[in-house]
């Protein structure tokens, strides 16, 4: 017999091997219709799991996040079941899921599929779900599983990687699939789902392999939740920087040029220059020296830094030179800044040395990860490396955190979290193997954040290979968590490059290195701001601040040119709409382009030597003298 304690405080004895569902039916009948899974001794289990030891049992219902994850996971298998009936001989590979949805990658072989097929696929899914099929898990040996999936080379490859682990196969009706995650125990709970989109994918993200099909979907326990989520997805789509850019033309992408290689168009380039000048000016005031360094380098420098060992898969292939040397497009700016420091002998009195650069880098992002400006293969990082003494670590780190917060205030960024990113101590391949160094750096990082009295989360496995870091995390419009700012403590690279400074006693010491970026890459930061402002940038950032609209080009253009000249001389970004279109069309166009101020020029404006303007999204028209309008714009420029 085993003793089971329920969450309501009840304790009962059961036969060893009694499953959770039996206990629910006997003692928790109110939970029977809404039960999805359970925690047993704090471990998530399925309702048909037999219990074989004493423990505490907690039933979770439709509202629990783990229930939604299990539902979406199980729905992905229901989709596979339907697809296997409609499209015989397909080869399922693998998928993923969370509380909001799922996807599965499938080799359809000779079959063609598009989103136009979704209705018929969903219909088949409903037909299967309504059969109320039990979903059963069974454990198999490696050899047995190989025989079952002998006709699916993708599954055989996955089995090969897990041959020494337990191999679970799930069955619903006559459909089976290899799976290690948890399921709900009957298809009757799968009622409210929607297939969302199709994209290309590669097995294990390897673009050298055959391109297969990825199908996305989402599933909920009731219709209202599904409908609400579909509305949210539509809102996210409309807030996605790629969608916003369709009307505003800040950047473009070209498959002919290459994947992940963006073009900055005129208006996007204007905003980028403003951001770059802003951050460079702040860094110069903060004691940084700004440099330019080569975008390619001898591969040996990345061997010295360790990037070649730990980052090779993210680097573009080497270029073979006639003299036998190998050059690579740099994936990081760090080694170049190490060489600048090494070019001179420093005294302890001269530290900190702060070297900053808007450094262009190239990274071979997987094709499936490339997205708009958010994930690209060519990027420019707001990068800096600070060389300090041990006694300067905390003071310098705190300055950087304050710098980040100041910049975020200016850009009106207020929804972010601090994350301390540590190594995974078991992963000796990914991280430099020096426990003492890692423990020291991680402890210092945590002490600093506690002293600053800032809330933070801690995660393992997200550190750089050479040291732990503070990441500032934001959410994109699509719900992806991205790093906007990063500060890293590094005891390793200065030693690998033999960097030193002369101490007070005349001896040579190795400096400590802080890597930091305040606004990420220009590409990622711009994509975030585009979503943050939904294309309507604050006045000081707007690529075009004022548009002049002459009612009649023959009669009003000269006065418009005069106003434009005055505004340009005062430092404002202004254009004249000289299209041969109606006034209402030009005003609609200005609204579409989200221009902060629209000035209409007609007979009255010329006669009284005034302007008539209105602001974006406002109907009120205001008349005033140009000098007063300039004072208004100057005050707007100061509102960061």
Curated annotation (Swiss-Prot):
Its main location: cytoplasm. It is an enzyme of class 6 (ligase). It holds the Pfam family tRNA_SAD. GO terms for cellular component: cytoplasm. Its EC number is 6.1.1.3. InterPro entries: aa-tRNA-synt_IIb, aa-tRNA-synth_II, aa-tRNA-synth_II/BPL/LPL, Anticodon-bd, Anticodon-bd_dom_sf, Beta-grasp_dom_sf, TGS, TGS-like. Residues 240-538 are annotated as: Catalytic. Its cofactor is Zn(2+). Keywords: Aminoacyl-tRNA synthetase, ATP-binding, Cytoplasm, Ligase, Metal-binding, Nucleotide-binding, Protein biosynthesis, RNA-binding, tRNA-binding, Zinc. Disulfide bonds: none annotated. Belongs to the class-II aminoacyl-tRNA synthetase family. Homodimer. NCBIfam families: thrS. This is Threonine--tRNA ligase. The gene is thrS.
